[in-house]
Design a protein with these regions (language model features):
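Conserved catalytic cysteine-centered active-site region
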Residues: 59-114, 157-160, 172-176, 234-262, ...
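Condensing-enzyme catalytic core mediating Claisen C-C bond formation in acyl metabolism
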Residues: 1-28, 152-167, 241-312, 320-321, ...
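Conserved beta-ketoacyl condensing-enzyme motif
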Residues: 26-114, 119-144, 213, 219-229, ...
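N-terminal extracellular/periplasmic Venus flytrap/periplasmic-binding protein-like
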Residues: 14-16, 26-36, 44, 157, ...
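Active-site pocket-lining segment
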Residues: 297-380
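Active-site-proximal alpha-helical scaffold in enzymes
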Residues: 89-120, 128, 185-214, 269-277, ...
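Flexible glycine-/small-residue-enriched beta->alpha junction loops
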Residues: 113-183
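Short, well-ordered amphipathic alpha-helical segments that serve as non-catalytic structural scaffolds
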Residues: 30-45, 69-73, 98, 177-184, ...
Length: 426
């Protein structure tokens, strides 16, 4: 272990273009996509054959065959097979949490370099069998004779044969993230117009980033895809206003397919290291990984908003680092739903919430919206759950590197009432 905490740097990142579910990546697995993202990272930073200190990644939707996903990715990638690896899981915060864990190991001197990432596919989601059928099959497998197995299998009924397709619902409530957010939108009085404006800006900013070539050193093509499949460069506020609600009340709902992220597929990876490790290899670190915080809310008994945990994580992070909400040059807030972003921002402006829930004397205040997701967000790029963290880290590190100085805030909401936040500096 190091005698003192060492600075940790984001050297850079790579991802494959995110695609809508059942699109170009319909037959690609988590392992396929994450390996492609890691190989792109290896090509960009000359890591082929390099033994990295550690590798951590994860996926929200995993098959049983992917129990050792990260290690299998390493073994199939251009990294040295001697690179150790393990899986991380925190729903939509997985990619960022993987980076936090790796940054911690670098900071205390356990390793000098690491790769963190995430992958998710809703096109190749695991399909389960009926629970009763599963138990019968397990009972049959335990039998010592053919007759015993047949007796167990004769218990199977036609209704047990139908597969169980995974659904995007919280196990404790039976509601989807969208349905939970629709409740939050009503509670915080988030208007349809405000949500559509956020979605519009997300697409405009990402389209401009592609047009300027800004994404070129952050993305590697995969299976014929060179840009994010969800991006609508020609969208307008008028087009968005015509869409019907998909969550909440059919007549008064405000959440549409455009101001909510679609199911999607993709993968990302980021390279973290000490400054010396990077310089020795001729690499220029982009931003320092300063600190991070995770939080959770009780959305079951206390009925808090499912995706409102970042509203708690961020002020704790600010307090520990002696910062205010306004002390940032960039804000990278994950746009699972426009309503969730706007509700979080509104909570930080709300005196009652900040006093009663956060224990503050006054509101955190507002952010400069011109600094929010300036190169596009999840509403435009899409949100392959575990891959979002890597996209955001790489984006923010590049923004800070280009500016030459400054500070950026990351905020990601996650299923299960969780949230993760982090600070990067240059």
């Amino acid at each position: 272990m190091a005698d003192k905490i060492r600075p940790v740097w984001v050297v850079g990142g790579n991802r494959i273009p995110f695609q809508r579910s059942d699109g170009k990546y319909a037959h690609a697995s988590n392992q396929d996509m994450l390996t492609a993202a890691v190989d792109g990272l290896a090509d960009r930073f000359g890591l082929e054959g390099e033994r990295i200190g550690d590798f951590a990644a994860g996926a929200v939707l995993k098959h049983s065959r992917e129990l050792n996903l990260s290690r299998e990715v390493v073994l199939g990638s251009k990294l040295a097979a001697e690179t150790p690896a393990f899986d991380v899981g925190q729903a939509c915060g997985t990619g960022l949490e993987a980076a936090i864990v790796m940054a911690g190991k670098i900071a205390v001197g356990q390793i000098d370099s690491a790769v963190a990432g995430g992958s998710d596919t809703t096109s190749d989601a695991p399909i389960a069998i009926n629970e009763s059928l599963r138990r019968i099959l397990m009972d049959a497998n335990r039998q010592k004779t053919v007759q015993g197995r047949l007796r167990q299998l004769l218990r199977v009924r036609p209704g047990m044969i139908a597969p169980e397709i995974p659904v995007n619902r919280e196990a404790r409530t039976g509601l989807s993230m969208g349905e939970h957010t629709a409740i939050t939108a009503v509670e915080w009085e988030i208007t349809r117009e405000a949500q559509d404006e956020l979605a519009y800006n997300s697409h405009v900013n990402l389209a401009a980033a592609y047009a300027a070539g800004w994404q070129d050193d952050l993305i590697s093509p995969y299976l014929g895809a060179e840009t994010d499949g969800n991006l609508r460069a020609d969208t307008t506020i008028e087009k968005l206003a015509k869409l019907k609600p998909v969550f909440g009340d059919r007549d008064t709902g405000t959440m549409t397919a455009a101001n909510s992220t679609p199911l999607s597929d993709g993968a990302s990876a980021v390279l973290l290291s000490t400054e010396d490790w990077a310089r020795e290899r001729g690499l220029a670190p982009r931003a320092r990984f300063v600190d991070a915080e995770a939080a959770a809310v009780d959305y079951i008994v206390k009925k808090e908003g499912l995706l409102m945990a970042p509203a708690y994580a961020v002020p704790r992070l600010l307090a520990r680092n002696g910062l205010t909400l306004q002390d940032f040059d960039f804000y990278e807030i994950h746009e699972a739903f426009a309503a969730q972003v706007l509700a979080t921002l509104k909570a930080w402006e709300d005196e009652a919430f900040c006093k009663r829930r956060l224990g503050l004397d006054e509101p955190l205040g507002s952010i400069d919206r011109a600094k929010l997701n300036v190169r596009g967000g999840s509403l435009a790029a899409a949100h392959p759950f575990a891959a979002t963290g890597g996209r955001i880290i790489a984006n923010l590190a590049k923004l800070l590197d280009e500016k030459g100085s400054g500070r950026g805030l990351i905020s990601i909401c996650a299923a299960g009432g969780q949230g993760v936040a982090a600070i990067l500096e240059r």
